[in-house]
């Protein structure tokens, strides 16, 4: 602990108007000042603190300077590294975090089903500009419509769902707006068949749809085509003939029409 020497007869009288002012001799114009220079921590050893007289101006009281020196001396006795290195940070982390092995688990499909499904409304016409209409409760047909009959054209609700991870195409399901009917692919006899299937609107559409409802949408310039996810290389198709049912076919670019124009509608 630093100590302030006791006053003796050899010490001169000083006066000051303010604690923050310099100390001057009471009887002379020499204006001899007394202040303490901050110690160099690198030079401090076991010998204690060395007080020095300096001619530099400090706007601090003598009591404040002595308190600062005592505090600096206590800090100088603390053990510390000159540079903060990576090992120091690693040691801190080891005290806070505990390393444990990470295991991966496959999530149940229920969580995927709860995900929000993004959808849009659209109309589809084949390359011959035939529109799709609902000919009976569960049959879609493609035919040319006159202007006064365009209200018969089916509006699809296209929902974006989960597909195979290894497939880069866009998986979608196609439902009829406000009818709870969805296009699906089923095997009838020995041939995949396209049909309309009614679903509970409280449960569908959902992110993880059954594979028979899923189609992979591919865009080719300004046209789109829809391939069955359950039956690869089978596509939603229309006939070149008028007023025939929409079906599932394999003849791309042949007699059957597999490419469509899509008109996106506002919600």
UniProtKB/Swiss-Prot annotation:
<dbReference type="Pfam" id="PF02394">
    <property type="entry name" value="IL1_propep"/>
</dbReference>
<dbReference type="GO" id="GO:0033092">
    <property type="term" value="P:positive regulation of immature T cell proliferation in thymus"/>
</dbReference>
<feature type="site" description="Important for interaction with integrin">
    <location>
        <position position="177"/>
    </location>
</feature>
<dbReference type="GO" id="GO:0032729">
    <property type="term" value="P:positive regulation of type II interferon production"/>
</dbReference>
<feature type="site" description="Important for interaction with integrin">
    <location>
        <position position="188"/>
    </location>
</feature>
<dbReference type="GO" id="GO:0001660">
    <property type="term" value="P:fever generation"/>
</dbReference>
<dbReference type="GO" id="GO:0005829">
    <property type="term" value="C:cytosol"/>
</dbReference>
<dbReference type="InterPro" id="IPR000975">
    <property type="entry name" value="IL-1_fam"/>
</dbReference>
<dbReference type="GO" id="GO:0051781">
    <property type="term" value="P:positive regulation of cell division"/>
</dbReference>
<dbReference type="GO" id="GO:0005764">
    <property type="term" value="C:lysosome"/>
</dbReference>
<protein>
    <recommendedName>
        <fullName>Interleukin-1 beta</fullName>
    </recommendedName>
</protein>
<dbReference type="GO" id="GO:0005178">
    <property type="term" value="F:integrin binding"/>
</dbReference>
<dbReference type="GO" id="GO:0006955">
    <property type="term" value="P:immune response"/>
</dbReference>
<feature type="propeptide">
    <location>
        <begin position="1"/>
        <end position="114"/>
    </location>
</feature>
<feature type="site" description="Important for interaction with integrin">
    <location>
        <position position="169"/>
    </location>
</feature>
<dbReference type="GO" id="GO:0005149">
    <property type="term" value="F:interleukin-1 receptor binding"/>
</dbReference>
<dbReference type="Pfam" id="PF00340">
    <property type="entry name" value="IL1"/>
</dbReference>
<comment type="subunit">
    <text>Monomer. In its precursor form, weakly interacts with full-length MEFV; the mature cytokine does not interact at all. Interacts with integrins ITGAV:ITGBV and ITGA5:ITGB1; integrin-binding is required for IL1B signaling. Interacts with cargo receptor TMED10; the interaction is direct and is required for the secretion of IL1B mature form. Interacts with HSP90AB1; the interaction facilitates cargo translocation into the ERGIC. Interacts with HSP90B1; the interaction facilitates cargo translocation into the ERGIC.</text>
</comment>
<feature type="site" description="Important for interaction with integrin">
    <location>
        <position position="202"/>
    </location>
</feature>
<keyword id="KW-0666">Pyrogen</keyword>
<dbReference type="InterPro" id="IPR003502">
    <property type="entry name" value="IL-1_propep"/>
</dbReference>
<keyword id="KW-0963">Cytoplasm</keyword>
<dbReference type="InterPro" id="IPR008996">
    <property type="entry name" value="IL1/FGF"/>
</dbReference>
<feature type="site" description="Important for interaction with integrin">
    <location>
        <position position="179"/>
    </location>
</feature>
<dbReference type="GO" id="GO:0005125">
    <property type="term" value="F:cytokine activity"/>
</dbReference>
<keyword id="KW-0458">Lysosome</keyword>
<dbReference type="GO" id="GO:0019221">
    <property type="term" value="P:cytokine-mediated signaling pathway"/>
</dbReference>
<keyword id="KW-0202">Cytokine</keyword>
<keyword id="KW-0964">Secreted</keyword>
<comment type="similarity">
    <text>Belongs to the IL-1 family.</text>
</comment>
<comment type="function">
    <text>Potent pro-inflammatory cytokine. Initially discovered as the major endogenous pyrogen, induces prostaglandin synthesis, neutrophil influx and activation, T-cell activation and cytokine production, B-cell activation and antibody production, and fibroblast proliferation and collagen production. Promotes Th17 differentiation of T-cells. Synergizes with IL12/interleukin-12 to induce IFNG synthesis from T-helper 1 (Th1) cells. Plays a role in angiogenesis by inducing VEGF production synergistically with TNF and IL6.</text>
</comment>
<dbReference type="GO" id="GO:2000556">
    <property type="term" value="P:positive regulation of T-helper 1 cell cytokine production"/>
</dbReference>
<keyword id="KW-0395">Inflammatory response</keyword>
<dbReference type="GO" id="GO:0005615">
    <property type="term" value="C:extracellular space"/>
</dbReference>
<dbReference type="GO" id="GO:0071222">
    <property type="term" value="P:cellular response to lipopolysaccharide"/>
</dbReference>
<keyword id="KW-0497">Mitogen</keyword>
<dbReference type="GO" id="GO:0010573">
    <property type="term" value="P:vascular endothelial growth factor production"/>
</dbReference>
<dbReference type="InterPro" id="IPR020877">
    <property type="entry name" value="IL-1_CS"/>
</dbReference>
């Amino acid at each position: 602990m630093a100590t302030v020497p006791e006053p003796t007869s050899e010490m001169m009288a000083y006066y000051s108007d303010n604690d923050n002012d310099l100390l001057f001799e009471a009887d002379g114009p020499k204006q001899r000042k007394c202040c303490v220079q901050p110690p160099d921590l690198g030079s401090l050893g076991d010998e204690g603190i060395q007080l020095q007289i300096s001619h530099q101006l400090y706007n601090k009281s003598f009591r404040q300077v002595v308190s600062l020196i005592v505090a600096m001396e206590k800090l100088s006795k603390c053990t510390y590294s000159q540079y903060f290195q990576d090992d120091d940070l690693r040691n801190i982390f080891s005290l806070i975090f505990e390393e444990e092995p990470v295991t991966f688990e496959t999530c149940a499909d229920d969580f995927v089903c709860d995900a929000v499904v993004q959808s849009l409304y659209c109309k589809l016409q084949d390359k011959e500009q035939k529109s799709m209409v609902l000919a009976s409760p569960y049959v879609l047909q493609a035919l040319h419509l006159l202007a006064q009959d365009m209200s018969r054209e089916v509006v699809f609700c296209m929902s974006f769902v989960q597909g195979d991870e290894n497939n880069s195409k866009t998986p979608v399901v196609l439902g009829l707006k406000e009818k709870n009917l969805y296009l699906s692919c089923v095997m009838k006899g020995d041939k995949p068949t396209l049909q309309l299937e009614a679903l509970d609107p409280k449960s569908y559409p959902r992110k993880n749809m059954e594979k028979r409802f899923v189609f992979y949408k591919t865009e080719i310039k300004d046209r789109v085509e829809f391939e069955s996810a359950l039956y690869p290389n089978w596509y939603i198709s229309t006939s070149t003939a008028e007023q025939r049912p929409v079906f599932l076919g394999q003849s791309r670019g042949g007699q059957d029409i597999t490419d469509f124009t899509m008109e996106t509608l506002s919600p």
